[in-house]
Amino acid sequence: ILREHLQNNSTLRHKLFQVEFLATLSGEMLITLVYHRTLDTEWEDAAEALLGVLASHAPPFSIIGRSRKQKIVLGKDFVQETLPIQDREFRFRQYEQAFSQPNGSVNIRMIEWACEQAAMAQGDLLELYCGNGNFTLPLSLHFDNVIATELSKSSIRAARENLLENGIKNVQLVRLSAEEVTQA
């Protein structure tokens, strides 16, 4: 549906350079259209129409139009992923252009494996490059305290939101590089 709509709409097709997808296991999807031109109200109207067509076919969709120094968000600039891990559901906000594990099913297995390895652990955990808290949140249940470091501002923001959303209180997020951690 998306491809057909883009091919048949000259406003959406004109200087379209790239299409990016961010999807959840539940089917929620964020589509980013990247252009080599300035986006105007005509583009926004065409994208709104596309969003309406997509919404009639599946779970929630959002569209982002990007061009040099320009970002137009129709809907949200994130998806909400829910991962069932060891008899608990964890909710993760995943932002556009921020790293997230691309395969939700494999991600669940990786997290469960890490939690199994940590099941007998005691004490505290130091996690480097925690991203949006993908491993941090589930692993925090196996430790007294967690210090999680990350460089990316958007990932730190997502991790903070994810900790709050999941009611996890034993994690401290710090914006540091691994090099800064080793110097501390």
Predicted segment positions?
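Rossmann-like S-adenosyl-L-methionine
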Residues: T38-A184
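Residue-level marker of positions within ordered structural domains that often coincide
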Residues: Q7, T24, A119
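Structural motif
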Residues: M29-L30, D124
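Short edge beta-strands and adjacent turn/loop segments
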Residues: R13-S26
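Extended interfacial segments that mediate partner engagement and assembly in macromolecular machines
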Residues: I1-L16
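Short beta-strand-to-loop capping motifs
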Residues: L33-R37
